[in-house]
């Protein structure tokens, strides 16, 4: 009896199943280790596969680390990559199988009773399952199969994109037509394809045959056209989610299969034997192959080349079940397919009995409810250290550290004075409070040196930043250079996968140094969390940022955290290290008093007299990756970390004592986890602090593990050495572990154990005495330590902390790699790059590299690789190329000598592509480029497409260097040329060179259209081939010719008048190409032979662009009808139309036919592109076999235009390429060097080049006055000792710092005793502090200091070089104090002092420096004797002048009153200032004698010299200059400009009468007059004024200043609104002659200096504004000040257009822009002062409450500098003490008479008016003011509603314009603000005449926007794009957007009252933000309407809801075609926007 058996059929599905959803269910299974292992293997494999891809392919994949992350991101993606789809489908099928057959009770299927079926992708899974007999066998093969599926999908995606580019969401490539049989479908398709003339690559085809219908596949556009026709029943078609072409024999060949499998290359699996019956999806029969390799080949053929025959599978299965076999029943197990039931039904229909379907393998059923919380297994990767750098005690770099270690030096020394003063802080008795007993430490050489510009820190911020933080930045950069780490260049170097970990255990800088003057940057500068945080911010790392404090083990604990993050998969790269910079004496005092520290010097580690540790400094950084990632990235692996761990000595008797058991436990834990024998560790770097207890305990714990006495001793091959770096460089505390690790790394690198220098006397007696017996050693001299053959050396680094923690790290040698083959390097020429952020650094970097090359003679390919692909590149850059090192060396030396080395490359230059036409081809023209796999694979694929289309192979054109090209058919040449050009362009693009425009000459336009995205690759090849084919078939070759002539079209027509010819090409205005028959061309040549014109007959078989083409045009048009044309992704410069094309409408069959026949007007096309700005400043890359078009480009555009070729005939390809790359690189193009080198990596290595040469400057805030010693003392809490006079009310500071004494005196100028001095002296009715008050303050403090210093006994105070820079105008009384401070710093060695006068806030914050001076202390007696000797002569001159009064007409006498009337135009005086009673004046000699007697003298007050006296005694000098006979006060008046010296020999009395004599001379070169004045009391000299300076001021300027007088200004109310006249005074009328020139360039430079905070001395020509911190906001500020102070109308974009000082200066001096406000010569300091005095009134109540602007480099008080003209900068605020809005003048000037309207623009969601900076000038009569949100940079404070914030806006608007009519507007939500403001102003009775709403939503409760929207905008560059350069947005930007939306969320606008509603203009953008972007924005069904407003294409351009708020009849509606919400504010769209606004505002004007 025959036993009937059941057959089981396992059916693996295809891509139609949702594999991701199934996998997301399976990954929740945590109790199946084999399944988890499979997912981990797949994840690792896919990451590696993607990482090996070219960048152009890699960037299209989502990034992931875990399998769960991969699934989540694929599920969210709207367009998953076919390679991932296919891989995940295969993964899902195999995972379901693994899950089922690892479940209890399930064995691997029986080979006899099981049949496997694979549908498409499922055939791969069936092959893997069928070649195994257990799950254990299956795991590696399953992973390999998934990767084959990935590669197949990658290949399919490539073919898909070549056939039809993806332009949005993916479209289906397959449709199911139920009920249609195969034969009918085949005939239908054949007929349809012929009728449409579709190329073979575009024609739909049958991909699946089933009993119930067929599946058709093809291009989505072709399928849609097919279904739209009447050929097929569209209503029955079902779309299948297949998004690429499969089962297409016309698209894939066997070579493609081989290519896929060649890349799979796992030969160990190929021989696996097939164990199961697997049905063919082609024949339905069992596949007759034996091995896995053959099965996979068959499967790929079935997937790619053969249709899926479901009908045959059903038939075959049915026959098997109906056969005589004992198997009578069948169970179908479907996996990842829904075909189970239909297959069962079909089998039953065939008569098969007992068919069941068991869905148990589907994931949802397989998982059921047996999920557990068991976690999955984590990987145990080894970790690679790939880079390190540091600053160490007495060693500024790694090499210096090794040198001192090698020499065994102890670098402990006395504490440097810049840390603290050992004389005051060290007290061995410790009796003095807060002192320490040790003066020793191990110190960094120059901890304050830092390159602030490199890291974009302002000179103000840099000193406040902790030196540890600064040095961490620099060492991190150096370590990354060491490692060759370029963020975002590889999968493991992605910025969001890099974490930063630093150990730091104190805040010394913040506690001691920067806390002495807490400022804006105190927190980010001093808090240790910012040490790693600053790294993340500057380097843009988005991974974790940890600051670790575990006391002394902090650095290694940070490394432990970093290792865990790497092993867990949280990050892929770790930057880790430690810092310790000692500036706080308290910590040292505390450690010393806690008995930690040695009093005798350094750590005496292992010494018997060890008495504590010595504190040490250091900053170290290392770069770590997982070992497999480091290998994959070709990183320089220095050592491998086998394990790291941290524990705690919880059982110790004291928290500060180490515990032997805990230390032993940590060693054992690390060794066990790493699987390492303790005896294999050859060196232990011990903690070794040098304490008796600590050293002994550590030694015991180390020996107990690594050399226990109870076990066998170590052999000689196992010798163990011990040591500690602390004996050399002290105990670095938080950096001690990293220093020890770096020492260990260098030991491995240098094969040496350095000597231990800690034993000063004898070894610690507490150590075991049998160390030698145990073979344990302490090196006393350098010991060679070579790596054993075939083995590794291992080192344990131990670190413990005073807080009880222990951290240990185990490292070993890096893996030994096989010697790399040098034969693989085909490149004959190589590039070497050097770059820097400044010219000085660049020069230093070049010199360093030259020295390195001389010393090491590196391999040139690796040198090229390291300097390009493994370096971050900066704006100052050079590149050279050559075949060998000597040539590279010589070229670099030439660069050093070239002046261009100072030049900065322009940022992110654009390149345009020009495609060569006919005539440049030659055999073998692309042969060398085939070495690039990207180029080679493109060529192979294009050749396959050409052959598929029926064209011959064009490979002979490229591959052979022999033969004549004329022997090749035109079809081969033309198709080969087009394909080669496309491949070349794609090669350039793979290197990061994306075209900004394309142009093709003749045949070259086909490749240009493909690269522009207009044509797919398949269609391009079809069109080029079809055209050439038609030419070959329908036109006779060589019957016509083409002739190039060196002349214009017009001259050609004149010379060839009456002849027949066609103008084929107009290449340039002087180069023309003719076409015609041979006879016609011969005739033309005869005529031209008598001319000198250049003429060349072209070697072409046809006369293109002539009548010869006409026979093929209709056929060509017909053939092109089946081609699809797309929107250009880049502008196409069309020689046919002579214009730039940016839409697809012009393209089509007609265009191509005309292109073939009509003239190539290359010259006009380029002229149009230039006029349209498409190619402005672009570089050109010529794509072709030989540079022909380059010359045309230069002749048409600019002879200096930079063009680079790709190839050049008869020239080495590598030489051409490297030269071109060098030109692009030096021009500022960012090249993707990793892609350039990718194919040659096996022969390349990362060299250890010299580190970057920093531009170092000292930034240090000195700890002063020893205040740590007095903290808490009563004396410490007291104020400064008292000193009080009338003009110095108190001393606010008195301190001594070394040899310097600082004294600061303060006066309240509004106090009753001082106020009269100020109000009694007025300029244009403004009370100004006179120089006499400054002088009195300085004299008082000088006298105070003189009396303090015994050495100054017998001296007098001499006040010298008084220079009043900015006037000090007083405010109204009753407004609180108005404080002026005098700062005197005296050098006690020279006894010379500097003096500065500052206005300050009541809190003491400096506002403006008003004057400078100096003081000296000459011997009083000697000085008086010297002047008294001259007194007799002076008195004789005075008597002689009196005698000449009646005889010399030039001598005259007048009363003081007359004199004051003469100078009244300068100033007005109270009677107290009018003390000159008479003047005797000699006009010829400019000499005067004056009598000074005071009116109504005040006798109260305490003075050194009464200010009235000082002023009155100096007045006669002005009388001399303004009252002499030559003076013409109608033209010029003279003002006082200070003096060189002023001193008094005795006290003066205001009740006495004095005589003075003065004689002036001049002018000098600066136009100054000078002289000395001597003051007499009777015959005694009592005072001398030396070097009095006076300068003339043009009267017109004085009149202008007088006209600006505003008597109400000084008393303006605190509310602060100005009336119209005030506004005019603040913004003077324009001087039409104002223009940019050399004079006001200095003024501009001063403005830039003040706004950036960078001293003028540092504004070197090469200084880049980016590096100076001139961002968009600062650029606006500078431009606003240029406009208002210099009258120069420059836009803020000049800082982008001219990015360096040098470029801006050159532009500045070229000519004059529009002018606005008047300017005064920047060279004239006195004129500046006079000009400013008229504007100097500033309400100090307002300013004292202003936000500190010093971060911008200037105070809101600042008005004028001594060398430039400056008015108060226009970043003004309301006077409210609360936060207030600010505004900037963006265009025009409201004060100009020609200004008829001021438009106020409110900020958008960014809060910044910089959004409007790109608007070109609207109209000369319109001023534009941009308003900034008060919460712009502090969005966390933006919690108020719209009413509150708009009130702040209104206050600022009314400050500028008190009354209407107003013009308001705004973009985006700025329009909402402007609407609400308009309503509020109308409610206040003001008129709003115009309202402009720019793409603004109706305010009916704004929707909250999802975070993904902001992230998307940032990703595509909308938030940080500057001139096409993607930059990171400011950190506050997105937060402000969100805060703004929160504020407006509840605002529902009410309608405007109709009778006072403004005229309204509404301007709409038309396009969605992602119209031209990839990827598209992730739109979701639940998106709020507000999001749709921003992201959707507009269709309604009406009022769109605004008509409910404003009268529609008063609206003007405009739209911006082609622009989206963001782009409408930029570029050409911004120009159109300005024009629209102008048209609206100028109605009626």
From Swiss-Prot:
Knockout or disruption consequences: Impairs the production of asparasone A and causess the formation of greyish-yellow sclerotia rather than the dark brown sclerotia normally produced. Leads to a significant decrease of resistance to insect predation and increased susceptibility to the deleterious effects of ultraviolet light and heat.
Region annotation Product template (PT) domain: where it falls in the sequence: 1640-1709
Region (N-terminal hotdog fold): 1289-1422
Stretches for region Disordered: 1612-1636, 1735-1776
SUPFAM superfamilies with a match to the protein in the record: ACP-like, alpha/beta-Hydrolases, FabD/lysophospholipase-like, Probable ACP-binding domain of malonyl-CoA ACP transacylase, Thiolase-like
Gene Ontology BP terms: fatty acid biosynthetic process; polyketide biosynthetic process; toxin biosynthetic process
Superkingdom in the source lineage: Eukaryota
Protein name, entry field: Non-reducing polyketide synthase pks27
The organism of origin for this protein: Aspergillus flavus (strain ATCC 200026 / FGSC A1120 / IAM 13836 / NRRL 3357 / JCM 12722 / SRRC 167)
Record gene name: pks27
